[in-house]
Amino acid sequence: MGNIMSASFAPECTDLKTKYDSCFNEWYSEKFLKGKSVENECSKQWYAYTTCVNAALVKQGIKPALDEAREEAPFENGGKLKEVDK
């Protein structure tokens, strides 16, 4: 299979995802695993990618449903069930 990365769910973000994936894989294999660095050096690429994804979530109308699902998430308090008002 090699080093094939998956595309982003939002096609307009795929280039940013590819850049982040490449940066992260290089950092992880060449620095982190060899004990040369513990700080992820790809935060700029990650921020650019997540900003694009968040914009796509809004554009596609997915964000409100995602926010609602996060509100209803049963394990959002350190693995403990969230108390629900009855």
UniProtKB/Swiss-Prot annotation:
Keyword annotations of the record: Cytoplasm, Disulfide bond, Lipid transport, Mitochondrion, Nucleus, Transport
Cysteine disulfide partners in this protein: C13-C52, C23-C42
Biological processes annotated in GO: intermembrane lipid transfer; mitochondrial respiratory chain complex assembly; mitochondrion organization; phospholipid translocation; phospholipid transport
Short motif Cx9C motif 1, span: 13-23
Effect upon mutating W27A: Impairs interaction with UPS1 and UPS2
Family: Belongs to the TRIAP1/MDM35 family.
Protein name: Mitochondrial distribution and morphology protein 35
Organism annotation: Saccharomyces cerevisiae (strain ATCC 204508 / S288c)
Species classification: Eukaryota, Fungi, Dikarya, Ascomycota, Saccharomycotina
Gene that this polypeptide is encoded by: MDM35
